[in-house]
Amino acid sequence: MVLVKKPVLKPFASLEIKVDPPITIGETSLGLRXFIPIPIRSGTITGEVKGRILPGGADSQMIRANGRTDLSARYVIETADHELIYIENNGIRQVSKPFRKQAAAGEIIEPEHVYFRTVPTFETGSEVYQWLHDRLFIGSAERTPDYVLLDIYEVQ
């Protein structure tokens, strides 16, 4: 039997993303649509890539009847060496059943009661960061009243 090498998660970067409160579009046939047209005010990235998150990103959320939230965020990082990297970060957030009503009311739920994972992808014209196109990444996130905290791992 051939043993396939198991993937390893290597810490890549930590992001602190300053966000605005959501604008709720309302109940649609798919669920409660919350859209934040320009939620990202600023932020930082530390780790293998260092820099700042530029204002003006977009984030949309679909909150389903079972409490699951589908997330899609897009924003731009300006690295410390003045390169630009576009990030598209899709994922899910599921709150433990006992806390779903509070979450639906906009309350921040303690992270131990929330499964919040993402799959970020990167695009850049920078030669320095072209390698980001050829790697897979996953993220683990936490929401605070004003920030999304995101730790990204490279899948090796």
Curated annotation (Swiss-Prot):
InterPro entries: UPF0311. Belongs to the UPF0311 family. This is UPF0311 protein YveG. PANTHER family: UPF0311 PROTEIN BLR7842. It comes from Bacillus subtilis (strain 168). Pfam families: DUF3237.
